[in-house]
Amino acid sequence: RASARSKELMVRTWRPERDRHVVVVVDCGRASAALLGAPDAGADTIEIGVAPRLDSGIETALLLGALATRAGDQVHLLALDQRVRARVSGIRGGAFLGAAATAFQEVVPSLDVTDWQLAVSQVRATVRHPALVVLVTRVPPAGMDVDFLEAVRALSDRHTVLIASATDPDQDRARTDAEDVLMRAAAALEERTDQAGVAD
């Protein structure tokens, strides 16, 4: 109808929501110190992908931050364990990635257990409006880390919570290899009992 009243064609363009808040929390605690990948046997070579889980977490935070900043969102990055190790907040545009890389360059994994209540309080102090909160950590086995579950529950009352976790391809391969070995052993045992004439 607007085009009918105007001499020019009116077009409605869709533009995604902007100025949302995105908070990325990187776990620097004990879980982040685990190596992803297996070291190569050669002493003179470095296997690509063999690094602490923290490295993958920092890369995730930088990538998410750059994408969200480019989309026009307000990005806040936190790295913590028992205390806040790095924080980037309130920086927009092209300066964001440089500031984030500088803030994270001194962050190393610690052997402390991550204080997830600290993460909750830091997120609440950082953003007052509903936000997307990305927790970059190892997903604990079901029911094992009660503090983590309580933190996720507390954050999800007000925010949308996403958990990002890197998996170790060598552990996944070992898990499937172990299952395969057990299945073959069970089949071999079954075959031997059949050959021996042992009844069930």
Enumerate the language-model features and the residues they cover.
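Short glycine/proline- and charge-enriched loop/turn segments
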Residues: 41-42, 95-101, 178-185
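Well-ordered alpha-helical segments embedded in enzymatic catalytic cores
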Residues: 60, 118-122, 147, 197
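Short secondary-structure boundary/hinge segments and terminal tails
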Residues: 86, 122, 172-173
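An amphipathic, basic-hydrophobic helix/alpha-beta surface used to engage anionic
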Residues: 1-95, 130-137, 150-151
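Hydrophobic alpha-helix feature that most strongly marks membrane-spanning transmembrane helices
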Residues: 27, 69, 105, 109-112, ...
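Short, contiguous acidic/charged loop-to-helix segments that flank catalytic cores in large enzymes
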Residues: 49-53, 107-111, 134, 138-143, ...
